[in-house]
Design a protein with these regions (language model features):
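N-terminal beta-strand motif that seeds the catalytic metal site of vicinal oxygen chelate
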Residues: 1-18, 65-67, 116-118
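Vicinal oxygen chelate
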Residues: 1-2, 84-118
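Core segments of cupin and vicinal oxygen chelate
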Residues: 10-50
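Structural preference for long, well-ordered alpha-helical segments within the folded cores
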Residues: 21-22, 80, 106
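Short acidic/glycine-enriched loop/turn segments that link adjacent beta-strands
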Residues: 37-41, 62-63, 94-98
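Short hydrophobic/aromatic beta-strand element in the GNAT-like acyltransferase core
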Residues: 42, 51, 68, 99-100, ...
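Mid-chain, well-packed structural core segment of small domains
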Residues: 66-83
Length: 118
């Protein structure tokens, strides 16, 4: 098997409207208009050409399940989010990269990832 790419990441959220406000209003993702008419609530988002699917359901606990958003400048991103009242972990090095975490309104962990020198 040779996958071409990751098509989407699906995340369970307790409140679709609150999650949609957070992901679009705070994290800057854009809502996609092409979500099929599924029986469960949800929304499709675009994150730099990658899809993030919000699905109404119970989110799992902990940091083990998360996805990462690549950011250009982690310090600027943390400052901007904290200025908006969003709780963000302090940055920490991971190899040549750096990361910090935020949580959406349902408690899902989102890694903010700044790539290091190759």
């Amino acid at each position: 098997m040779r996958p071409l790419a990751v098509h989407h990441v699906s995340i369970n959220v307790a409140d679709v409207d609150a999650a949609l406000d957070f992901y679009t209003g705070v994290l800057g993702l854009e809502q996609r208009p092409d979500r099929p008419d599924f029986p469960m609530g949800g929304a499709w988002l675009d994150a730099g050409g990658q899809q993030v699917h919000l699905i109404e359901g119970t989110p799992p606990p902990g940091l083990g399940q998360h996805f990462a958003l690549l950011v250009e400048d982690l310090d600027d991103t943390i400052t901007e989010l904290r200025r908006e009242g969003i709780e963000v972990s302090d940055p920490r090095p991971v190899g040549r990269s750096r990361q910090a975490f935020v949580a959406d309104p349902s408690g899902n962990a989102i890694e903010l990832h700044e790539a290091g020198a190759a």
